[in-house]
Amino acid sequence: MYYLSDLSHYAFFTYISVRAGFAFFIALCLSLFLMPKFITWAKAKNASQPIYEYAPETHKTKCHTPTMGGLIFISSAVIASLFCIKFDNIFAISALLCLILFCLIGLIDDLGKVLKKDNHSGLSPRMKLLAQIIAGLICILPLYFSSELSTELFIPFYKHPLFDMEIFAIAFWILVLISSSNAVNLTDGLDGLATVPGIFSLSTLGIFLYLSGNLNYSEYLLLPKIQGLGEVVIICAALIGALMGFLWYNCYPAQVFMGDSGSLALGGFIGFLAVISKNEILLLLIGFVFVLETVSVILQVGSFKIFNKRVFKMAPIHHHFEKVGWVENKIIVRFWMIALLSNLLALASIKLR
């Protein structure tokens, strides 16, 4: 679509905002169109993920809900992005690679569980971690060696970099990608619980990407200046559109789950956006709901191993609230509210520096 701008009547396609808008609506329409067809096919093939044996009783009714919906919304976002991005932009190509590779890891994990009807038959934790490290390196190393991405570490509400991480930045960036990917995966336990906070996080990071990629805005707002970064906003917009199409079928009561193919890709991509926009630390606030879920699991496992006591009735923490009597829809909406507030606070850091 960008290359149509060479024609005199289509010069508006040079604008990132225009192409982002097109990418959003293309992905939204694709997701809305393809998802019901996928649901019908998945039901016919009995492609549903087995429910965790210790899950709350209310989850037993979800055993026939199709999974792997992430394959559809990720595909929709990638197709829409390919129509709209510039192919000579290393940030955009790396971002698409991130989406595709993490989706493939999740898809392999999903297929193992679906085909064997066993929640433990996907990728082993060790194999999944290794695959995520390799995928992260494929996405990150081209940026590092091209010198397009600064290795300096920035913190929220402070305009100067703390220090230069140099080659250690690679390990730190991989840690951010993997942590974000697995955090979203842990959160995806209730209908729409990971989807809406994911949309909020993508929107916030998309704003940072656009501002940092614009030399005038970044200079005025004292943000890191990274030329060419704005092109990734188009992929961001496409994924938001695809997620909104998915949410139509994923909201309570869900007709389809995103599965690991969706949650690992969404989380990995959010982590990637945080890395390239230099918001690795701010991601703790941008993805606060994901952080909360992950910390609850760490506390639960750590407490049980050290003290033989549980901090929560069940982890991740959304299951704890189910156990104490909160209805699923109330938990979901309250977590959405927390995600919205945390992202508004993160956006406040743009001016408060």
UniProtKB/Swiss-Prot annotation:
Mind naming one GO cellular-component term on file for this protein? plasma membrane
Catalysed reaction(s) here are:
UDP-N-acetyl-alpha-D-muramoyl-L-alanyl-gamma-D-glutamyl-meso-2,6-diaminopimeloyl-D-alanyl-D-alanine + di-trans,octa-cis-undecaprenyl phosphate = di-trans,octa-cis-undecaprenyl diphospho-N-acetyl-alpha-D-muramoyl-L-alanyl-D-glutamyl-meso-2,6-diaminopimeloyl-D-alanyl-D-alanine + UMP
UniProt topology in membrane: Multi-pass membrane protein
Q: Name one Pfam family in it.
A: Glycos_transf_4
Q: In which pathway does it act?
A: Cell wall biogenesis; peptidoglycan biosynthesis
Q: Where in the cell is it found?
A: Cell inner membrane
Q: What is its EC number?
A: 2.7.8.13
Transmembrane annotation, as ranges = 22-42, 65-85, 88-108, 129-149, 161-181, 192-212, 228-248, 256-276, 281-301, 330-350
Similarity comment: Belongs to the glycosyltransferase 4 family. MraY subfamily.
Q: Which PANTHER family match?
A: PHOSPHO-N-ACETYLMURAMOYL-PENTAPEPTIDE-TRANSFERASE (PTHR22926), PHOSPHO-N-ACETYLMURAMOYL-PENTAPEPTIDE-TRANSFERASE HOMOLOG (PTHR22926:SF5)
- Give the protein's function: Catalyzes the initial step of the lipid cycle reactions in the biosynthesis of the cell wall peptidoglycan: transfers peptidoglycan precursor phospho-MurNAc-pentapeptide from UDP-MurNAc-pentapeptide onto the lipid carrier undecaprenyl phosphate, yielding undecaprenyl-pyrophosphoryl-MurNAc-pentapeptide, known as lipid I.
Q: What is this protein called?
A: Phospho-N-acetylmuramoyl-pentapeptide-transferase
Record lineage: Bacteria, Pseudomonadati, Campylobacterota, Epsilonproteobacteria, Campylobacterales
